[in-house]
Each structure stands twice: as C-alpha cells, then as structure tokens.
Amino acid sequence: MCDIRYFKRALSLYKTAVREYQTGQADEYTMNTVAYSLQQVVELVLKCHLEFVGVTVPSTHDISKLVRMCKNNGACITITEWIDDNTEKLTAWETQTRYNMDFFVERDKAAKALKMIKEFLDINYISYEKY
C-alpha cells in the first residue's frame, strides 16, 4: 500500500528546492542541492504510485526505470512530457550532484526544472492542501 509519507516528503523536498533557489547563493553547489532535491521529488512520487498499484518498489534512483514501471504496471499517474523527456538528466542529478565534484547544474536548468516539476506535482494533484 502507498505510504502517504512519500508525498509529504516529496512536497517538503520541493519546498526546500524552491527556498534554496530563491534565497540561496547562486553558486554551483546551491544549484546542485536544488537539482538533487528535485530528482528526489520525482523519484518519491513515482515510487508512491508504484506502491499504490501493489508493485514492490526497487532500490533504485533510475527515473527512466521508475517511469517505465509506472507505465507498464498501470500506475494512476500522469507522466508529463518534460519528465518523460528528462529522465536521464534527472537520474544524473541524483548521483552526479553528490559524488562528482566537477559536475554543476546551471541556474537556468534548475529554474526550468522547478517550474516543470511543480507542473508534474499539480497535474497529479499533489499539494500541501491535500496532504
């Protein structure tokens, strides 16, 4: 069964990403924190929807794999075009922003991701008012 805490954690991470983007320094390390948080938002939402349809969620951060699993298992989730087109980038944000000291996410890419992931949350009715 879906653990609602996945959604609550995803919303908390989204809020953290927004706050870091708006009030943090515009340096590469801050943008990496924003990107990592956004990847986690998408991952948690996908995993919750998989659990909801009875799929055992694997220990993976691979957004492509999770999207594929949602589609193949009838998860009741809308995968936006931006999410579908950026699965590899989002997956890279999980590992590269944490372990590759030469990897940096540009501010404009973080801004675009903030907007598009908010759209993903909204279209799937994931909001603070609901949870």
Residue ranges and their predicted role:
Residues 1-131:
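Terminal alpha-helical segments
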